[in-house]
């Protein structure tokens, strides 16, 4: 018997998350904020095509079960990162391509009656912004990075558990369960272009993770 499950993170920038020098690019109309993603994730590829988010990590996996034991397991799913469009009003605009990082997938761990999967995907957005740094020159032009690490446990009885175990310092990471329902909202940082020394956020309940059940 094959059991399949998935967990998805969507990362986006709300209007209240950008402050300081970088806010001018958004308020001028050259850049755009993101509308909140839907509460129910029906078609991730279509949301990506329409530019509704900056980044998504979809961890999908399967486990083959025989006599109550997991005998084989594997991954599906992928990461999505959107282009960045800079508008020049009536003169048009320019679309900048992001840089995708290699997908990091741990080998499925088979533990008798369950299997554990872990996936990290992300990238660097297409347009650099001024970011404050310690010491001279006090600002650097750097494109923000965005990534999440998701974990999925599939059990032989057909149940599963999903976790957001770590994430980059990006304003919003929303987590969707196997059925596409919004399961958690993580506000990791108010400004994606803030202090470069804040490399990651670890949020949630016990152990610093966001955990929910399927």
Regions found by a protein language model. Name each.
Residues 196-214:
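Cyclic nucleotide-binding regulatory module and flanking cytosolic helices
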Residues 177:
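Short, acidic, Ser/Thr-enriched surface-loop or helix-capping motifs
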Residues 72-76, 160-165:
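Short beta-strand segments that buttress and anchor functional surface loops
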Residues 173-174:
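A residue-level detector for well-ordered beta-strand positions
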Residues 185-187:
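Beta-strand-dense domains in secreted/periplasmic systems and polymorphic toxin scaffolds
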Residues 1-68, 74-156:
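Solvent-exposed helix/loop surface patches that form functional interfaces
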Residues 168-170:
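Short, small/polar residue-rich loop motifs at catalytic or cofactor-binding pockets
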